[in-house]
UniProtKB/Swiss-Prot annotation:
It comes from Arabidopsis thaliana. This is Alpha-amylase 3, chloroplastic. Coiled coil: none annotated. It comes from the Eukaryota. Possesses endoamylolytic activity in vitro, but seems not required for breakdown of transitory starch in leaves. May be involved in the determination of the final structure of glucans by shortening long linear phospho-oligosaccharides in the chloroplast stroma. Can act on both soluble and insoluble glucan substrates to release small linear and branched malto-oligosaccharides. Works synergistically with beta-amylase toward efficient starch degradation. Has activity against p-nitrophenyl maltoheptaoside (BPNP-G7), amylopectin and beta-limit dextrin. Involved in stress-induced starch degradation.
Length: 887
């Protein structure tokens, strides 16, 4: 699917130029940093920025002569040896606010025009269609030819895309006008607005904008103009579907006398990217043996360097001893903050750092305001220094990672890890034996699972500390697409943060893969480690969840080549990619002799033996289903050897051909989890998660407090996979719904004082979420309570489990708050097995302390973390939620 080329529409309409800020003449205050490290801290502050674009900057060689005072005297030194020089691209994201307007007016007698406009500059596309009289459902149709403005193109057979054009030079409004054909049987006009620059779709109250042209168009809360009389065109029954021309003309004149003009506005905000750069030069001063670092940037406004120094072969931040330069402050005894000096012309700022020659490097991030931190591709800026005069610092592209030899300590730890694994196996056998005895051993099994969790965490901790280290900066670009180390199959490292990279409407553009590529750097800088892509195969439904030919990877999201390029792009920025594998059902190519669709084509040309026998809709000759049936398509019989063989080959082919790192498994309730284990063993994913979604427990319409039966069903499925895949924590989502909506926060603690979802029983296999393409987006099957989304994210992004963030929420007004929570989770190294101590669970407030270094509360009630040996400071806060971290 292609989109409208609109290069002529103000191609650089929103390219910002940094305005020069004149603060008057200011004398330069040199920065002197005479550093002697004495305190070690963990690496701080993952950024909210993203990195693209490069710009050049002028630099002057400088040296700092040490004095007995607290400041230094700056003098030029042309003889300094350059040991490091780099220009880092950075990107700031700002929010522009404006409006979308819809106007209906009579331009001439009996000629009506509908205009849609936007006040924010950009490459705007109107994606629209119509509903005809007598239509049922929500599907669009294409409008009559004479209603299509110039420059419109057809999208398949259901929509039109028309570019908005700038009204006039110097005008900030973009608009498209549609001449209404009132002689046709069009009942309503439907549209969404798309920003070609960002790929964002703008809807009305979570649905399409709908402009009714008749009175009784169903109102789903998204009608425009109906309250002002628009739509008074007569009842549907009064407009014949087929008429001769003269009859239609007569009737349209009679029926459209009630048409009235209207004008409506809706607020809109757009995230705008501004490209800047940071230039860093490090020199060795031969006279003082100091390392002189120059940092220069064209970022506007006040820029603060949040920094630390490195030594002893690590990148851990260490705080120096005094003296500090002017405008430097201590941050939580973990880092220093130094405000850069403004340039004389006000366009950017710079600073000079004189560092001890024995140090190994300088780490820093940039702070622009309370919620804006900039780093480089999700990592701290790092300036390495020479360790000897004969070993120059290699650039990132030139370095090649070299594995270290195993030490005796590592070999010993490896043996100890094997002992732990043996113990875990024994515990698993213990669980199995209890099940075979058919005794009531639920509590025993739970205790065993908890013991396994502890042992697994211990083994993983040993693994992380003893795995041979590779240079973090020295990976060849050709090798970056396929990481050499896989920590485990199906369960990841424990520190994953998942981004769902699509919504229910993403297929409509036909170029979703290309749009995602443009967001790779930003998603990496936010701290995401895993991206979930939509189903890639040919599908009867455009969203991809009714697969047909599994080996045809040209879909409504893009071509197979675009898919492969997208995966490579995300690998390049350090993000793993999950494919959405629909294994439960498959749409047939041909009918059988009875006219039933159950014969398949393509490379996997199965017959009706591949279809389960107990679904009467599709007359399968396989065995009975091992799960629940999905009645919209033939359910596949996974008990058949040839089916499992073909699926395993297909998954392995997808891994090899596309480069997927793992799977999101659709509708796993439809077949036994043991088959999933078989598929995971064959494809060896880095991370895998299944969608096991069924109803929670209710009594007389009220949600039960105890949801153990619900989470037990999910845990049983995970057990059936032998833990080879995790599962979405539907239990936690459901309990959050009721707790937040009814102000019943006591629900968030189970009778044993633990989280009440899967995350409370098996956190390393629980993928927590608050929304996805089914529950939210334009489907809205189970939408999270409106206005309380950030409370949900404050919960899942601070708690154990693997959190998943929905695409629509990332690129919304919640962006900065979600980014701050992501930064906190990464900064404090929270993980899927983090320990939760629930401190409060009452009617109007829930509070917990995680790993003794993060405290959080949600709900309107009051809470402050307990005073003690820890010093708490507020890290993130918003409407009815607050998060603290230790200092």
């Amino acid at each position: 699917m292609s989109t409208v080329p609109i290069e002529s529409l103000l191609h650089h309409s929103y390219l910002r130029h940094n305005s020069k800020v004149n603060r008057g003449n200011r004398s330069f205050i040199p920065i002197s940093l005479n550093l002697r490290s004495h305190f070690t801290s963990n690496k701080l502050l993952h950024s909210i920025g993203k990195s693209v674009g490069v710009s050049s900057m002028n630099k002057s060689p400088v040296a700092i002569r040490a004095t007995s005072s607290d400041t230094a005297v700056v003098e030029t030194a042309q003889s300094d040896d350059v040991i490091f020089k780099e220009i880092f691209p950075v990107q700031r994201i700002e929010k522009a606010e404006g409006k979308i307007y819809v106007r209906l007016k009579e331009v001439k007698e009996k000629n009506w025009e509908l205009s849609v406009g936007c006040s924010i500059p950009g490459k705007w596309i109107l994606h629209w269609g119509v509903s005809y009289v007598g239509d049922t459902g929500s599907e669009w149709d294409q409008p009559p030819e004479d209603m299509r403005p110039p420059g419109s193109i057809a999208i398949k057979d259901y929509a039109i895309e028309t570019p908005l054009k700038k009204l006039s030079e110097g005008d900030s409004f973009f608009e498209v006008a549609i001449n209404l054909n009132l002689e046709s049987s069009v009942a309503a006009l439907n549209f969404v607005l798309k920003d070609e620059e960002t790929g964002a779709w703008y809807q009305h109250k979570g649905r399409d904008f709908k402009v009714p042209l008749v009175d009784d168009v169903p109102d789903n809360g998204n009608l425009i103009g109906a309250k002002k009389g628009f739509g008074a065109l007569g009842q549907l029954s009064n407009i014949p579907l087929k008429q001769d021309k003269s009859s239609a003309e007569t009737d349209s004149i009679e029926e459209r006398k009630g048409l009235q003009e209207f004008y409506e506005e809706m607020p809109i905000s757009k995230r705008v990217a501004d490209d800047n750069s940071v230039s860093v030069t490090a020199r060795k001063c031969p006279e003082t043996s100091k390392n002189i670092v120059s940092i220069e940037t064209d970022l506007p406004g006040d820029v603060t360097v949040h920094w630390g120094v490195c030594k002893n072969g690590t990148k851990k931040w260490e705080i120096p001893s005094e003296p500090y330069p002017e405008e430097t402050s201590l941050f939580k005894n973990k880092a220093l903050r130094t405000r850069l000096q403004r340039k004389d012309d006000g366009n950017g700022s710079f600073g000079l750092f004189s560092l001890d020659g024995k140090l190994e490097g300088l780490c820093f991030v940039l702070k622009l305001n309370e919620n804006t931190w900039l780093n480089y591709r999700g990592e701290d800026f790092y300036v390495p220094f020479l360790t000897s005069s004969s070993s120059p610092v290699e650039t990132e592209a030139a370095q090649v990672s070299k594995p270290k030899r195993k030490t005796d300590k590592e070999v010993s730890a490896s043996g100890f890890t094997k002992e732990i694994i043996t113990e875990i196996r024994n515990l698993a056998i213990d669980i199995s034996s209890h099940k075979n005895q058919k005794t009531n051993v639920k509590e025993v099994q739970e205790n065993i699972l908890q013991e396994i969790e502890k042992l697994a965490a211990e083994a993983y901790s040993i693994f992380r500390s003893t795995t041979p280290a590779f240079s973090e900066e020295g990976v060849l670009e050709a090798e970056a697409d396929k990481p050499d180390i896989k920590i485990s199959s199906g369960t990841g490292s424990g520190f994953e943060i998942l981004c769902q990279g699509f919504n229910w409407e993403s297929n409509k553009s036909g170029r979703w893969y290309l749009e995602l590529q443009e967001k790779a750097d930003e998603l990496a800088s936010l701290g995401f480690t895993v991206l979930w892509l939509p189903p890639p195969t040919e599908s009867v439904s455009p969203e991809g969840y009714m697969p047909k030919d599994l080996y045809n990877l040209n879909s409504r999201y893009g071509t197979i080549d675009e898919l492969k390029d997208t995966v490579k792009k995300f690998h390049k920025v350090g993000i793993k990619v999950l494919g959405d594998a629909v294994l439960n059902h498959r749409c047939a190519h041909f009918k059988n002799q009875n006219g039933v669709w159950n014969l398949f084509g393509g490379r996997l040309n199965w017959d009706d033996r591949a279809v389960v026998a107990d679904d009467p809709h599709f007359q399968g000759r396989g065995n009975k289903s091992s799960g629940d049936n999905f009645h919209a398509a033939p359910n596949i019989d996974h008990s058949q050897d040839f089916v499992r063989k073909d699926i395993k080959e297909w998954l392995c082919w997808m891994m090899e051909e596309v480069g997927y790192d793992g799977w999101r498994l659709d509708f796993v309730r439809g077949f036994w989890g043991g088959y999933v284990k078989d598929y995971m063993d064959a494809s060896k994913p880095y991370f895998a998660v299944g969608e096991y979604w069924d109803s929670l427990s209710y009594t007389y319409g009220e949600m039960d407090y105890n949801q153990d039966a619900h989470r037990q069903r999910i845990v049983d499925w995970i057990n059936a996979t032998s833990g080879a895949a995790g599962a979405f924590d539907v239990t936690t989502k459901g309990i959050l719904h009721t707790a937040l909506q009814k102000c019943e926060y006591w629900r968030l603690s189970d009778p044993k004082g633990k989280p009440p979802g899967v995350v409370g029983w098996w956190p390393s296999r629980a993928v927590t979420f608050i929304e996805n393409h089914d529950t939210g987006s334009t489907q809205g099957h189970w939408r999270f309570p409106e206005g309380k989304e950030m409370q949900g994210y404050a919960y899942i992004l601070t708690h154990p489990g693997t959190p998943a963030v929905f695409f629509d929420h990332i690129f919304s007004d919640y962006h900065s708050e979600i980014a701050a929570l992501l930064s906190l989770r990464n900064r404090q190294k929270l993980h899927c097995r983090s320990e939760v101590n629930i401190d409060k669970s009452e009617r109007d407030v829930y509070a917990a302390i995680i790993d003794e270094k993060v405290a959080m509360k949600i709900g309107p009630g009051h809470y402050e973390p307990p005073n003690g040996s820890q010093n708490w400071s507020v890290a993130v806060e918003g409407r009815d939620y607050k998060v603290w971290e230790t200092s």
